[in-house]
Amino acid sequence: MRVVVAMSGGVDSSVVAGLMHEAGHEVIGVTLQLYDHGAATGRKGACCAGQDIHDARNVADRLGIAHYVIDAEAAFRAAVIGDFAESYAEGRTPVPCVRCNQHLKFGDLLGLARDLGAEALATGHYVRREDGPEGAELHRAVDARRDQSWFLFATTRDQLAFSRFPLGTMPDKDAVRAEAARMNLPVAEKPDSQDICFVPSGTYADIVAKLRPDAAAPGEIVTEDGAVLDRHQGIARYTVGQAKRLGAASGHVVTRIDAARRRIVVGPRGAGGREVRIAEPNWLIDPPAAPFRASVKLRAGETPHPAEIDIARNLVTLDTPALAAPGQACVVYRESRVLGGGFIL
């Protein structure tokens, strides 16, 4: 079987390429160049640029597989970085990894894989794909610490059917590195990339300030009734649920962001609501007509909340109140399986 492997130059995707090659597949490695090659060379913590492209090529040479580099900088800036800055300027808290998966890895790259005559796209994501009675299913990884299922909720059923995730059954990262060492891959001890790959130094707020200076403009920190408690240095530095960097408003939590008035609104800790509305829903099940019970995660690393899901109304009703940050994902689970989700309004 011809398989395209998304190779970032890190240990995870390199091991995937090696495992697919050992399984007897015809492997084609593809690296999406997301930044200017020269400017990115040597940037610690970056991904998919400079040294990473060099590492991916070395791994491909070691395995004896084809390797191509695709210039995806313009698409990445438009779909990921542009959306990232715009969201913060509008008071939302974006998830750039979801947008990158949605538009580049399982959009453009998967389309390229099909154009190359491949029968599958394999990536280094820590998730499991299982074949169920209604087709391919998305499940949490065995390694709960590295599970990335929340970030793949926007993957369509067709994309999921075409995709393979060999690392989903790995017990931990040590096992992945052991595989890399066994295959004598040059990246076996390479450090992991950081969460936001395009912010290798400084802070994400610096990136937002360059693209949307209005998001870095100072403003007021106020209570729900409008009482001014302190000043802030830009709404891009805050998210709903945040309890740090509130100055004289210490002891409160951010309950919403009023982007039009450049105000950070705070309330007592424990504040929250039960209703969560979502946009851009994507479902990996045949949507039932009636509301149903499931659990949801409003942030990647949090404990799931029991809830009622009304697909027809794009409405999630939590059993207990919680703070939901606009722009983040509300992902619906039934045990280990991802049923779908959407972006929080």
UniProtKB/Swiss-Prot annotation:
The record marks H125, Q328 as: Interaction with tRNA. Disulfide bonds join C100-C197. It holds the Pfam family tRNA_Me_trans_M. Keywords: ATP-binding, Cytoplasm, Disulfide bond, Nucleotide-binding, RNA-binding, Transferase, tRNA processing, tRNA-binding. The keyword Cytoplasm applies. GO terms for biological process: tRNA wobble position uridine thiolation. It is found in: Cytoplasm. Belongs to the MnmA/TRMU family. This is tRNA-specific 2-thiouridylase MnmA. It comes from Acidiphilium cryptum (strain JF-5).
